[in-house]
Amino acid sequence: MKTSLRTLSVALAAALVSPSVLAIEKIDFHGYMRAGVGVSSDGGLAEWQKTMVGRLGNESDTYGEIGLGAEVYKKEDVSFYLESMVSMLSDGSNDSETTIGDDAQFGLRQLNLQIKGLIPGDKEAVIWGGKRYYQRHDLHIIDTKYWNISGSGAGIENYTVGPGAVSVAWVRGDANDVDTRITGDSDVNINYIDVRYAGFKPWAGSWTEVGIDYAMPNPTKQQKEYGGLYDADNAVMLTGEISQDMFGGYNKLVLQYANKGLAQNMISQGGGWYDMWHKTDEAKGYRVINTGLIPITDKFSFNHVLTWGSANDITEYTDKTNLISLVGRAQYQFTQYVRAIGEVGGFYQKDTYHNGSNYKQGGEKYTIALGLAEGPDFLSRPELRVFASYLNDSENGKPFEDGTSNDTWNFGVQVEAWW
Protein backbone atom coordinates (compact mmCIF):
# COMPACT_ATOMS: atom_id res chain seq x y z
CA MET A 1 0.00 0.00 0.00
CA LYS A 2 2.82 2.39 0.91
CA THR A 3 4.53 1.59 -2.38
CA SER A 4 1.32 2.39 -4.29
CA LEU A 5 0.89 5.72 -2.49
CA ARG A 6 4.53 6.61 -3.09
CA THR A 7 4.17 5.80 -6.78
CA LEU A 8 1.02 7.93 -7.04
CA SER A 9 2.69 10.85 -5.26
CA VAL A 10 5.66 10.75 -7.61
CA ALA A 11 3.35 10.66 -10.63
CA LEU A 12 1.34 13.67 -9.41
CA ALA A 13 4.47 15.64 -8.65
CA ALA A 14 5.86 14.88 -12.09
CA ALA A 15 2.63 16.02 -13.72
CA LEU A 16 2.56 19.29 -11.80
CA VAL A 17 6.09 20.24 -12.86
CA SER A 18 5.76 18.99 -16.43
CA PRO A 19 6.43 21.56 -19.20
CA SER A 20 2.79 21.48 -20.35
CA VAL A 21 1.56 22.60 -16.91
CA LEU A 22 4.29 25.18 -16.37
CA ALA A 23 3.48 26.67 -19.79
CA ILE A 24 0.27 28.14 -18.34
CA GLU A 25 1.48 31.48 -17.07
CA LYS A 26 -1.96 32.76 -16.05
CA ILE A 27 -5.57 31.64 -15.86
CA ASP A 28 -8.28 34.04 -17.01
CA PHE A 29 -11.20 34.31 -14.60
CA HIS A 30 -14.36 35.91 -15.97
CA GLY A 31 -18.08 35.77 -15.50
CA TYR A 32 -21.39 37.42 -14.75
CA MET A 33 -23.77 37.54 -11.79
CA ARG A 34 -26.98 39.11 -10.58
CA ALA A 35 -28.69 38.56 -7.25
CA GLY A 36 -30.84 40.41 -4.77
CA VAL A 37 -33.86 40.56 -2.54
CA GLY A 38 -37.24 42.22 -2.84
CA VAL A 39 -40.99 42.18 -2.45
CA SER A 40 -44.01 43.03 -4.57
CA SER A 41 -47.58 43.94 -3.69
CA ASP A 42 -48.32 40.20 -3.66
CA GLY A 43 -45.41 38.30 -2.14
CA GLY A 44 -41.94 38.08 -3.65
CA LEU A 45 -40.63 40.09 -6.59
CA ALA A 46 -42.73 40.00 -9.76
CA GLU A 47 -41.02 39.54 -13.12
CA TRP A 48 -43.04 40.40 -16.23
CA GLN A 49 -42.17 40.78 -19.93
CA LYS A 50 -38.67 42.06 -19.23
CA THR A 51 -37.53 41.67 -22.86
CA MET A 52 -40.38 44.01 -23.81
CA VAL A 53 -40.50 46.60 -20.99
CA GLY A 54 -36.95 46.42 -19.59
CA ARG A 55 -35.09 44.50 -16.93
CA LEU A 56 -34.25 47.13 -14.30
CA GLY A 57 -36.31 46.40 -11.18
CA ASN A 58 -37.98 43.56 -13.08
CA GLU A 59 -35.83 40.51 -12.31
CA SER A 60 -36.55 37.98 -9.60
CA ASP A 61 -33.82 35.38 -10.10
CA THR A 62 -30.30 34.69 -8.93
CA TYR A 63 -28.05 33.94 -11.88
CA GLY A 64 -24.32 33.50 -12.29
CA GLU A 65 -21.73 32.44 -14.85
CA ILE A 66 -18.20 31.43 -13.87
CA GLY A 67 -15.61 31.10 -16.62
CA LEU A 68 -12.00 29.92 -16.61
CA GLY A 69 -9.69 30.08 -19.60
CA ALA A 70 -6.00 29.69 -20.33
CA GLU A 71 -3.52 29.78 -23.17
CA VAL A 72 -2.14 26.25 -22.82
CA TYR A 73 0.36 26.49 -25.67
CA LYS A 74 2.24 29.40 -27.24
CA LYS A 75 5.07 29.29 -29.76
CA GLU A 76 5.76 32.26 -31.99
CA ASP A 77 2.41 33.09 -33.68
CA VAL A 78 0.71 29.81 -32.78
CA SER A 79 -1.46 29.60 -29.67
CA PHE A 80 -3.98 27.13 -28.23
CA TYR A 81 -6.56 28.60 -25.84
CA LEU A 82 -8.99 26.54 -23.74
CA GLU A 83 -12.19 28.17 -22.46
CA SER A 84 -14.78 26.86 -19.99
CA MET A 85 -17.89 28.22 -18.28
CA VAL A 86 -20.64 26.93 -16.01
CA SER A 87 -23.85 28.69 -14.98
CA MET A 88 -26.27 28.60 -12.04
CA LEU A 89 -29.89 29.75 -11.90
CA SER A 90 -32.21 29.86 -8.89
CA ASP A 91 -35.00 31.97 -7.43
CA GLY A 92 -32.80 33.06 -4.53
CA SER A 93 -35.34 31.92 -1.95
CA ASN A 94 -33.13 29.83 0.31
CA ASP A 95 -29.75 29.71 2.00
CA SER A 96 -28.69 26.37 0.53
CA GLU A 97 -29.90 26.04 -3.05
CA THR A 98 -29.00 22.71 -4.63
CA THR A 99 -30.17 20.58 -7.54
CA ILE A 100 -32.48 18.66 -5.19
CA GLY A 101 -36.05 19.43 -6.19
CA ASP A 102 -34.81 21.79 -8.92
CA ASP A 103 -34.02 24.41 -6.28
CA ALA A 104 -31.13 25.47 -8.52
CA GLN A 105 -30.20 24.61 -12.09
CA PHE A 106 -26.60 24.20 -13.17
CA GLY A 107 -25.48 24.24 -16.80
CA LEU A 108 -22.41 23.70 -18.95
CA ARG A 109 -22.30 26.84 -21.11
CA GLN A 110 -18.84 26.84 -22.69
CA LEU A 111 -16.09 24.28 -23.22
CA ASN A 112 -14.00 24.93 -26.31
CA LEU A 113 -10.59 25.18 -27.93
CA GLN A 114 -9.51 28.25 -29.94
CA ILE A 115 -6.40 28.02 -32.12
CA LYS A 116 -4.58 31.00 -33.64
CA GLY A 117 -1.67 31.19 -36.06
CA LEU A 118 -2.32 28.13 -38.24
CA ILE A 119 -4.19 29.79 -41.12
CA PRO A 120 -1.77 31.01 -43.82
CA GLY A 121 -1.90 34.72 -44.44
CA ASP A 122 -3.80 35.67 -41.27
CA LYS A 123 -2.17 34.85 -37.95
CA GLU A 124 -5.08 36.40 -36.00
CA ALA A 125 -7.77 34.18 -37.57
CA VAL A 126 -9.17 31.54 -35.22
CA ILE A 127 -9.95 27.86 -35.74
CA TRP A 128 -12.31 26.73 -33.00
CA GLY A 129 -14.30 23.74 -31.85
CA GLY A 130 -16.43 22.80 -28.85
CA LYS A 131 -19.24 24.58 -27.06
CA ARG A 132 -19.26 28.37 -26.83
CA TYR A 133 -21.14 31.64 -26.79
CA TYR A 134 -20.75 32.43 -30.47
CA GLN A 135 -20.57 36.13 -31.39
CA ARG A 136 -23.76 37.00 -29.50
CA HIS A 137 -25.33 40.40 -30.23
CA ASP A 138 -26.78 41.76 -27.01
CA LEU A 139 -29.43 44.32 -26.03
CA HIS A 140 -28.45 44.70 -22.40
CA ILE A 141 -31.30 46.74 -20.91
CA ILE A 142 -33.91 44.23 -22.14
CA ASP A 143 -31.71 41.16 -21.48
CA THR A 144 -31.96 39.55 -24.89
CA LYS A 145 -29.72 38.64 -27.81
CA TYR A 146 -31.13 39.42 -31.24
CA TRP A 147 -28.44 37.36 -33.03
CA ASN A 148 -27.43 34.26 -31.13
CA ILE A 149 -26.86 30.68 -32.26
CA SER A 150 -24.60 29.63 -29.40
CA GLY A 151 -24.01 25.94 -28.79
CA SER A 152 -21.70 23.08 -29.70
CA GLY A 153 -19.95 23.53 -33.00
CA ALA A 154 -16.82 24.39 -34.96
CA GLY A 155 -15.65 27.07 -37.30
CA ILE A 156 -13.16 29.60 -38.60
CA GLU A 157 -13.45 33.07 -37.12
CA ASN A 158 -12.22 36.52 -38.10
CA TYR A 159 -10.39 35.65 -41.32
CA THR A 160 -9.43 38.92 -43.01
CA VAL A 161 -11.02 39.55 -46.40
CA GLY A 162 -10.70 43.07 -47.76
CA PRO A 163 -11.55 45.74 -45.17
CA GLY A 164 -13.36 43.28 -42.89
CA ALA A 165 -13.32 39.71 -41.66
CA VAL A 166 -15.28 36.56 -42.46
CA SER A 167 -16.49 34.03 -39.88
CA VAL A 168 -18.01 30.65 -40.77
CA ALA A 169 -19.47 28.28 -38.18
CA TRP A 170 -21.41 25.02 -37.89
CA VAL A 171 -23.44 24.98 -34.66
CA ARG A 172 -25.88 22.48 -33.19
CA GLY A 173 -29.11 23.66 -31.55
CA ASP A 174 -31.58 20.80 -31.05
CA ALA A 175 -35.30 21.11 -30.30
CA ASN A 176 -36.49 19.05 -27.32
CA ASP A 177 -39.81 17.25 -26.74
CA VAL A 178 -41.26 18.17 -30.13
CA ASP A 179 -44.12 15.65 -30.18
CA THR A 180 -44.19 13.19 -27.30
CA ARG A 181 -46.85 11.07 -28.98
CA ILE A 182 -44.06 9.38 -30.88
CA THR A 183 -42.53 6.30 -29.28
CA GLY A 184 -38.83 6.82 -28.74
CA ASP A 185 -36.81 10.00 -29.02
CA SER A 186 -38.87 13.19 -29.45
CA ASP A 187 -35.83 15.50 -29.63
CA VAL A 188 -34.88 16.75 -33.10
CA ASN A 189 -31.32 17.41 -34.20
CA ILE A 190 -30.96 20.87 -35.81
CA ASN A 191 -27.78 22.15 -37.44
CA TYR A 192 -26.99 25.78 -38.26
CA ILE A 193 -24.56 27.20 -40.79
CA ASP A 194 -23.63 30.75 -39.81
CA VAL A 195 -21.69 33.04 -42.17
CA ARG A 196 -20.79 36.63 -41.23
CA TYR A 197 -18.78 39.51 -42.62
CA ALA A 198 -17.89 42.30 -40.21
CA GLY A 199 -15.78 45.42 -40.18
CA PHE A 200 -16.52 47.27 -43.42
CA LYS A 201 -16.63 51.03 -42.71
CA PRO A 202 -18.48 52.97 -45.42
CA TRP A 203 -17.56 56.30 -43.79
CA ALA A 204 -15.70 57.66 -40.77
CA GLY A 205 -17.06 56.46 -37.44
CA SER A 206 -19.24 53.74 -38.96
CA TRP A 207 -19.06 49.95 -38.68
CA THR A 208 -21.12 47.26 -40.39
CA GLU A 209 -21.87 43.56 -40.12
CA VAL A 210 -23.97 41.27 -42.30
CA GLY A 211 -24.72 37.58 -42.00
CA ILE A 212 -26.85 34.61 -42.90
CA ASP A 213 -27.98 31.75 -40.68
CA TYR A 214 -29.28 28.58 -42.32
CA ALA A 215 -31.08 26.14 -40.01
CA MET A 216 -31.47 22.49 -41.05
CA PRO A 217 -33.71 20.17 -39.00
CA ASN A 218 -32.34 16.63 -39.17
CA PRO A 219 -35.01 14.20 -37.90
CA THR A 220 -34.38 10.49 -37.40
CA LYS A 221 -35.84 7.85 -39.72
CA GLN A 222 -38.63 7.13 -37.22
CA GLN A 223 -39.44 10.84 -36.88
CA LYS A 224 -39.60 11.26 -40.67
CA GLU A 225 -42.01 8.34 -40.93
CA TYR A 226 -44.21 9.86 -38.22
CA GLY A 227 -44.32 13.19 -40.09
CA GLY A 228 -46.38 16.02 -38.62
CA LEU A 229 -44.23 18.49 -36.72
CA TYR A 230 -41.15 16.42 -37.56
CA ASP A 231 -41.61 17.28 -41.24
CA ALA A 232 -39.98 20.71 -40.90
CA ASP A 233 -38.32 22.74 -43.65
CA ASN A 234 -34.90 24.34 -43.63
CA ALA A 235 -35.03 28.01 -42.66
CA VAL A 236 -32.97 31.15 -43.16
CA MET A 237 -32.34 34.31 -41.12
CA LEU A 238 -30.65 37.35 -42.68
CA THR A 239 -29.13 40.11 -40.54
CA GLY A 240 -27.60 43.44 -41.50
CA GLU A 241 -26.53 46.20 -39.14
CA ILE A 242 -24.72 49.50 -39.18
CA SER A 243 -23.33 51.35 -36.16
CA GLN A 244 -22.24 54.97 -35.95
CA ASP A 245 -20.09 56.74 -33.37
CA MET A 246 -22.17 59.58 -31.97
CA PHE A 247 -21.24 62.23 -29.37
CA GLY A 248 -18.86 59.83 -27.64
CA GLY A 249 -21.42 57.02 -27.74
CA TYR A 250 -23.03 55.10 -30.58
CA ASN A 251 -26.25 54.37 -32.43
CA LYS A 252 -27.02 51.09 -34.20
CA LEU A 253 -29.64 50.12 -36.78
CA VAL A 254 -30.42 46.42 -37.33
CA LEU A 255 -32.52 44.93 -40.14
CA GLN A 256 -33.53 41.24 -40.09
CA TYR A 257 -35.58 38.80 -42.16
CA ALA A 258 -36.41 35.19 -41.30
CA ASN A 259 -38.68 32.46 -42.62
CA LYS A 260 -40.05 29.02 -41.67
CA GLY A 261 -39.11 27.97 -38.14
CA LEU A 262 -36.89 31.01 -37.61
CA ALA A 263 -39.60 33.59 -38.42
CA GLN A 264 -40.99 33.74 -34.87
CA ASN A 265 -37.72 35.30 -33.63
CA MET A 266 -38.80 38.52 -35.31
CA ILE A 267 -41.66 39.01 -32.81
CA SER A 268 -40.42 37.05 -29.76
CA GLN A 269 -37.20 39.02 -29.14
CA GLY A 270 -35.36 35.80 -30.02
CA GLY A 271 -31.93 35.48 -31.57
CA GLY A 272 -32.17 32.46 -33.84
CA TRP A 273 -33.88 29.45 -32.21
CA TYR A 274 -35.93 27.18 -34.49
CA ASP A 275 -39.61 26.61 -33.68
CA MET A 276 -40.31 22.89 -34.12
CA TRP A 277 -43.52 22.99 -32.06
CA HIS A 278 -45.75 24.61 -34.71
CA LYS A 279 -46.36 24.26 -38.43
CA THR A 280 -44.29 27.04 -39.98
CA ASP A 281 -44.07 26.09 -43.67
CA GLU A 282 -45.37 29.51 -44.81
CA ALA A 283 -43.94 31.65 -42.02
CA LYS A 284 -42.08 34.89 -42.79
CA GLY A 285 -40.99 37.70 -40.51
CA TYR A 286 -39.16 41.02 -40.40
CA ARG A 287 -37.58 43.04 -37.61
CA VAL A 288 -36.10 46.52 -37.22
CA ILE A 289 -34.06 47.42 -34.14
CA ASN A 290 -32.62 50.80 -33.23
CA THR A 291 -30.44 51.03 -30.15
CA GLY A 292 -27.86 53.40 -28.80
CA LEU A 293 -25.98 54.79 -25.83
CA ILE A 294 -25.47 58.56 -25.79
CA PRO A 295 -23.53 60.48 -23.10
CA ILE A 296 -25.57 63.68 -23.22
CA THR A 297 -23.36 65.46 -20.65
CA ASP A 298 -20.45 64.43 -18.45
CA LYS A 299 -22.96 63.29 -15.83
CA PHE A 300 -26.06 62.34 -17.80
CA SER A 301 -26.36 59.44 -20.28
CA PHE A 302 -29.17 57.63 -22.04
CA ASN A 303 -29.57 54.11 -23.48
CA HIS A 304 -32.54 53.03 -25.61
CA VAL A 305 -33.85 50.00 -27.49
CA LEU A 306 -36.65 50.29 -30.06
CA THR A 307 -37.94 47.08 -31.64
CA TRP A 308 -40.55 46.69 -34.38
CA GLY A 309 -41.34 43.21 -35.63
CA SER A 310 -43.91 41.60 -37.90
CA ALA A 311 -44.47 37.96 -38.85
CA ASN A 312 -47.01 35.93 -40.82
CA ASP A 313 -48.16 32.34 -40.33
CA ILE A 314 -45.83 31.53 -37.43
CA THR A 315 -48.32 28.90 -36.21
CA GLU A 316 -51.03 26.87 -37.91
CA TYR A 317 -53.59 29.20 -36.28
CA THR A 318 -51.92 32.62 -36.61
CA ASP A 319 -52.36 34.89 -39.61
CA LYS A 320 -50.22 37.85 -38.54
CA THR A 321 -48.37 39.11 -35.47
CA ASN A 322 -47.09 42.67 -34.94
CA LEU A 323 -44.87 43.86 -32.10
CA ILE A 324 -43.52 47.23 -31.06
CA SER A 325 -41.40 47.76 -27.95
CA LEU A 326 -39.53 50.79 -26.62
CA VAL A 327 -37.32 50.90 -23.53
CA GLY A 328 -35.18 53.80 -22.33
CA ARG A 329 -32.78 53.97 -19.38
CA ALA A 330 -31.36 57.29 -18.15
CA GLN A 331 -28.54 57.71 -15.67
CA TYR A 332 -27.36 60.77 -13.74
CA GLN A 333 -24.03 60.58 -11.91
CA PHE A 334 -23.95 62.42 -8.55
CA THR A 335 -20.39 61.41 -7.67
CA GLN A 336 -17.85 58.97 -9.04
CA TYR A 337 -19.64 56.13 -7.24
CA VAL A 338 -23.27 57.25 -6.74
CA ARG A 339 -25.87 57.54 -9.49
CA ALA A 340 -29.61 57.93 -10.04
CA ILE A 341 -31.19 55.61 -12.61
CA GLY A 342 -34.58 55.68 -14.27
CA GLU A 343 -36.03 53.21 -16.76
CA VAL A 344 -39.32 53.37 -18.67
CA GLY A 345 -40.54 50.72 -21.08
CA GLY A 346 -43.67 49.78 -22.95
CA PHE A 347 -44.86 47.36 -25.63
CA TYR A 348 -47.85 46.39 -27.71
CA GLN A 349 -48.36 43.09 -29.53
CA LYS A 350 -51.32 41.94 -31.59
CA ASP A 351 -51.89 38.42 -32.91
CA THR A 352 -54.53 38.05 -35.62
CA TYR A 353 -55.82 34.52 -36.26
CA HIS A 354 -57.13 32.81 -39.39
CA ASN A 355 -60.61 32.57 -37.85
CA GLY A 356 -60.82 36.37 -37.66
CA SER A 357 -60.24 36.75 -33.91
CA ASN A 358 -57.25 38.48 -32.33
CA TYR A 359 -55.28 38.58 -29.10
CA LYS A 360 -53.65 41.74 -27.75
CA GLN A 361 -50.86 42.15 -25.22
CA GLY A 362 -49.36 45.36 -23.91
CA GLY A 363 -48.12 47.20 -20.90
CA GLU A 364 -45.63 49.50 -19.26
CA LYS A 365 -42.96 49.52 -16.56
CA TYR A 366 -41.58 52.49 -14.62
CA THR A 367 -38.48 52.13 -12.42
CA ILE A 368 -36.42 54.50 -10.30
CA ALA A 369 -33.21 53.38 -8.61
CA LEU A 370 -30.21 54.58 -6.65
CA GLY A 371 -27.02 52.89 -7.83
CA LEU A 372 -23.56 52.42 -6.33
CA ALA A 373 -20.96 51.46 -8.95
CA GLU A 374 -17.19 51.35 -9.26
CA GLY A 375 -17.11 54.17 -11.80
CA PRO A 376 -19.14 56.78 -13.69
CA ASP A 377 -19.54 54.96 -17.02
CA PHE A 378 -23.04 53.79 -17.96
CA LEU A 379 -21.94 50.15 -17.96
CA SER A 380 -19.60 50.37 -14.98
CA ARG A 381 -19.94 47.21 -12.92
CA PRO A 382 -20.15 45.88 -10.21
CA GLU A 383 -23.25 47.86 -9.30
CA LEU A 384 -25.64 47.74 -6.33
CA ARG A 385 -29.12 49.21 -6.84
CA VAL A 386 -32.00 50.06 -4.55
CA PHE A 387 -35.07 50.18 -6.78
CA ALA A 388 -38.82 50.66 -6.94
CA SER A 389 -40.89 49.63 -9.98
CA TYR A 390 -44.47 49.86 -11.14
CA LEU A 391 -45.69 47.31 -13.73
CA ASN A 392 -48.99 47.58 -15.57
CA ASP A 393 -50.76 45.34 -18.09
CA SER A 394 -52.73 47.76 -20.28
CA GLU A 395 -54.59 44.99 -22.14
CA ASN A 396 -56.39 43.54 -19.11
CA GLY A 397 -54.39 40.31 -19.08
CA LYS A 398 -54.35 40.21 -15.25
CA PRO A 399 -50.88 38.62 -14.91
CA PHE A 400 -50.43 39.57 -11.24
CA GLU A 401 -51.81 38.48 -7.88
CA ASP A 402 -52.89 35.03 -9.05
CA GLY A 403 -54.64 36.34 -12.14
CA THR A 404 -56.71 39.00 -10.38
CA SER A 405 -54.77 42.22 -11.02
CA ASN A 406 -53.43 44.17 -13.98
CA ASP A 407 -50.72 45.96 -12.02
CA THR A 408 -48.20 45.52 -9.24
CA TRP A 409 -45.15 47.17 -7.71
CA ASN A 410 -41.68 45.90 -6.83
CA PHE A 411 -39.25 47.15 -4.21
CA GLY A 412 -35.83 45.66 -3.61
CA VAL A 413 -32.06 45.61 -3.85
CA GLN A 414 -30.08 43.99 -6.66
CA VAL A 415 -26.40 43.61 -7.47
CA GLU A 416 -25.06 43.01 -10.97
CA ALA A 417 -21.49 42.43 -12.11
CA TRP A 418 -19.41 41.17 -14.99
CA TRP A 419 -15.67 40.74 -15.09
Swiss-Prot record:
It comes from the Bacteria. GO terms for biological process: monoatomic ion transport. Belongs to the porin LamB (TC 1.B.3) family. GO terms for molecular function: maltodextrin transmembrane transporter activity; maltose transporting porin activity. Involved in the transport of maltose and maltodextrins. InterPro entries: G_neg_Bact_CarbUptk_Porin (IPR050286), Maltoporin (IPR023738), Porin_LamB (IPR003192), Porin_LamB_sf (IPR036998). Homotrimer formed of three 18-stranded antiparallel beta-barrels, containing three independent channels. It is a multi-pass membrane protein. It catalyses: beta-maltose(in) = beta-maltose(out). The keyword GTP-binding does not apply. Induction: By maltose. Keywords: Cell outer membrane, Ion transport, Membrane, Porin, Signal, Sugar transport, Transmembrane, Transmembrane beta strand, Transport. The record marks 32, 63, 250, 418 as: Greasy slide, important in sugar transport. Residues 1-23 form the signal peptide. HAMAP family: LamB. Its main location: membrane. This is Maltoporin 2. It is found in: Cell outer membrane. It comes from Yersinia pseudotuberculosis serotype O:1b (strain IP 31758). The lineage of its organism: Bacteria, Pseudomonadati, Pseudomonadota, Gammaproteobacteria, Enterobacterales. GO terms for cellular component: cell outer membrane; pore complex.
